Amino acid sequence: FSFAGKQLAFDDPRSALFFEYLNILNHIKSVNPNVKFMLENVKMKKEYLDVISNLLGVQPVFINSALVSAQNRQRYYWANWEFCQPEDKEVMLIDCLEDDVDEKFLHTQKALEYMDRAVKGGRNHWDFKHHSDARSDKSQCITANTFKGVPYNVVIAFKENLRAKSKCVRSGGRGSFDRHEWDSADKIHVRKFTPTECERLQTVPDNYTNHVSNTQRYKMLGNGWTCDVIACIFEQMPIEK
């Protein structure tokens, strides 16, 4: 369904899992009509959104994780109880960045050249804003591809303590971050998000995923939920006594 993907919708095997979810839910309802359910999915075309909503019998609530974290992560949430948007916690990207990062997370010159190369219409990965920077409000949306490095995992970090957030956008314009400025800028580091920073962007406790390789941590976090959003939804679930 994702606008960032191939948009195969229900023809994608992963999206077709929705019908497995629906079959399981309907089976449980036949035993327990009062069962509570919740479903999350990406931003999608209205025609697909309507199919899911009609089959579930409820309308979704659209929530951006940016309200509770430093990440722009726009998702639809369906549940068979009423719930409101979470309050804005005003978390900045700088709040999630680690101070001392191992050099292995720094991008190589080869990686930066990959970001510079023309992709479509003479534009490059910088122009498409496949990166986050500490002077913006929020980070881009982390995905399962974050482990690949460029162009999915590029953050411009600063030695000085700037308080700001980064953004998740896909439109053009380098603005003040034209990379030619950075080459002589001592204070600027072009690197990957660390797994711990990704945990913070998903409001997961530090080192919660450190029992597996970094590659698996990135995939796990990119495919996961923003914990504080889910907590907000579940906190509003009515408890029958």
Locations of the language-model features?
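Acidic-aromatic/histidine active-site loop/patch
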Residues: I230
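Class I S-adenosyl-L-methionine
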Residues: F1-D183, H189-R191
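Short, hydrophobic alpha-helical segments
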Residues: F234-K241
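Generic structural marker for isolated residues within well-ordered, non-membrane alpha-helices
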Residues: L49, C198, N214
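Short pre-catalytic strand/loop immediately N-terminal to key active-site residues, enriched for Gly-Thr
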Residues: S213-K219
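FAD-binding beta-loop-beta segment adjacent to the flavin cofactor pocket
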Residues: I188-H211
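A helicase ATPase "motif cassette" and its flanking acidic/Ser/Thr-rich regulatory loops
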Residues: T226
